[in-house]
Amino acid sequence: MRFVIVTGLSGAGKTQAIRNLEDLGFFCVDNLPPTLIPKFAEACYQTDGKIDKIALVIDIRGGQFFDDIFESLNYLQKQGYKYEILFLDASDEVLIKRFKESRRKHPLAPDGRILNGILMERSRLREIKDRSDNIIDTSKLATRELREEITRIYSEEGQMETQLIVTVLSFGFKYGIPVDSDLVFDVRFLPNPFYIPELKNHSGRDKIVVDYIMDFKETVKFIDKLEDMLEFLIPNYLKEGKRQLIVSIGCTGGRHRSVTIANTIYNRLKDNGHRVNIDHRDIEEDIKGGKKL
């Protein structure tokens, strides 16, 4: 099990760090009182590997409870529970600027000068910083750069390259565009099998419909171009930290054209080694002639 305790100065990026760890598959808990760490660790270690990556945010918001952290860490060590400490730091100037931009009050100086709160927090965190396994200074890091550093330290080998999950989703425009779409493609420019009597009651999964749709040169050309576009976009989305991509392909009812095109794109991406899922949102709705809720 990998057990990471995330701490550091207010405004240094702990919230962003915990989000990045969550993207890497960590079970994350924010602002857990330090006195609860031992019981929480014991519960996690008793899951027989069902939970194998844990990240906790412990910071000065815990007030007087924060001072109990060393007793809890010593207990973990005596019990043989391995843990790592990640400390987020930044310069006083950068922290002051971030607090002013966000218009937030420093937790140790709610009615006073931000700098005084920062200096007080530095003093209280000095010992935990000295015990940290990894220290990241975010003063000059953009959000993307912090994410890359977190990934470098805490991802499994090769996870950064395979993290993006693509979902190819077919749908019918008459039932509405999927609200979670990242990319939407309209294939209603292709001839509609609905108006062919022998194809009307079939779906885009059936060979007779697939053969009809794929017989048009426009279909093949569109699929080739869409595949090329996705092969270009996927690594660039990944580089910017995107972890999921929803590619929605729509026709009128989501039963014929969009299903065939979505299946074809799914198979091509899968053959190219991508992590990809397929979902036909409206195929059953259109068969029943119902309305999408």
From Swiss-Prot:
Residues involved in GTP binding: D59, I60, R61, G62
Residues the entry annotates as binding ATP: G8, L9, S10, G11, A12, G13, K14, T15
GO MF term set: ATP binding; GTP binding
Coiled coil spans: none
Keywords (A to Z) from UniProt: ATP-binding, GTP-binding, Nucleotide-binding
HAMAP family referenced in this protein's UniProt entry, alphabetically: RapZ_like (MF_00636)
Family: Belongs to the RapZ-like family.
Record-linked PANTHER family: RNASE ADAPTER PROTEIN RAPZ
Known role: Displays ATPase and GTPase activities.
Protein name, entry field: Nucleotide-binding protein CKL_3564
Gene source species: Clostridium kluyveri (strain ATCC 8527 / DSM 555 / NBRC 12016 / NCIMB 10680 / K1)
Lineage, top ranks: Bacteria, Bacillati, Bacillota, Clostridia, Eubacteriales
